[in-house]
Regions:
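Short strand-turn segments of transmembrane beta-barrel domains in outer membranes
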Residues: 34, 39-41, 52, 57-86, ...
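Signature of Gram-negative outer-membrane beta-barrel scaffolds
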Residues: 236-267
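Transmembrane beta-barrel domains of outer membrane proteins
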Residues: 36, 56, 83-87, 97, ...
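Transmembrane beta-barrel strands of outer-membrane/channel proteins
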Residues: 68-72, 96-102, 140-146, 193-199, ...
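Short acidic/polar hinge/loop motifs at secondary-structure boundaries
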Residues: 10-37
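Flexible loop and strand-edge segments within Gram-negative outer membrane beta-barrel domains
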Residues: 103-126, 130-191, 197-217
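Extracytoplasmic beta-strand/coil segments of soluble accessory domains associated
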Residues: 1-11
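Short loop/turn motifs that connect adjacent beta-strands in outer-membrane beta-barrel proteins
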Residues: 44, 60-65, 90-92, 134-137, ...
Length: 267
């Protein structure tokens, strides 16, 4: 894709997660969606060509203490969301976001023997922390995810010796740490360090073929910012001279195995 997908300004939706990545972000978890056009700034990532889409999760210091919503459709799509944020004291806040959904009914409205849409089970749990002490601000987040999708022939159409079935199983864990320190508020002199990591594991079956894959990602972004003049009322107006410098590091490690059922794996 030419558009870089970010969560909390970290390149979280990439590689193996790109196929269903946006579905791993439940709507009730979103605090804001930020869209930019054109090539990206190195401040938030250098991989975008046509633009960036950044999703901000609910913040524990501003979200409701508890919020619950649940739904079920006529086609047995059931979903529940629980979110909550609490101020532990005047410096520390924490929040929990939970999502679960299940679609277990086999739908074949055109009666061709294949599922119109995959059966799906998804469980998603996130915990984040916010710390503010003096000139230091820190944010910490960890999330775990399980997702299963089943498609192919319906039960009524599986009389064949080798019925075509699709079974996608995904386990994922990711998280980040954001640390920022302000040295001079008048000049806007500060340093920010973002680190994130993720592990994504997929075990998939497509008929008589299996494709298993795992991805490990590590990301580091460190930015130093300052202004050369404290006379303006707005540190970032058009008449102010500012400096932003830093470094960015991104690592992806992949491990894949493809085989026919009963054969040795090809890695």
């Amino acid at each position: 894709t030419y558009v870089q997908m970010l969560t909390e300004n970290t390149p979280n939706i990439r590689g193996l997660a790109q196929a269903f990545g946006m579905e791993y972000i439940p709507g009730p978890w979103m605090d804001a969606i930020q869209v930019s056009k054109g090539t990206s700034s190195v401040l938030n990532g250098y991989e975008a060509i046509a633009g960036q889409i950044n999703v901000e999760y609910l913040k524990p210091q501003t979200q409701d203490p508890i919020a619950l919503n649940a739904m079920i459709s006529t086609e047995t799509h059931a979903e529940v969301n629980v979110t909550g944020g609490w101020d532990l004291n005047d410096k520390v806040a924490t929040g929990i976001l939970f999502h679960a959904q299940n679609m277990s009914l086999e739908l074949d409205h055109n009666h061709d023997g294949f599922l119109d849409m995959p059966k799906n089970t998804n469980v998603n749990l996130l915990n984040r922390w916010y710390v503010k002490t003096g000139d230091y601000t820190g944010q910490f987040l960890v999330r775990g995810l399980y997702d299963r999708r089943q498609g192919g022939l319906t039960k009524e159409a599986t009389s064949a010796l080798s019925p075509y079935k699709i079974d996608l199983n995904t386990w994922r864990v990711d998280g980040f740490m954001k640390n920022g320190y302000v040295f001079d508020a008048d000049l806007g002199t500060s340093i920010g360090i973002i680190t994130s990591a993720s592990y994504h594991n997929q075990q998939n079956t497509y008929g008589s073929r299996q494709w298993n894959a795992a991805q490990t990602n590590a990301y580091l972004n460190a930015i130093f910012q300052t202004s050369f003049d404290d006379s303006a009322t707005d540190l970032w107006d058009d008449h102010h001279h500012n400096l932003s410098a830093g470094l960015s590091f991104n690592y992806d490690g992949y491990n894949e195995a493809i085989r026919l059922i009963g054969d040795e794996a090809i890695r």
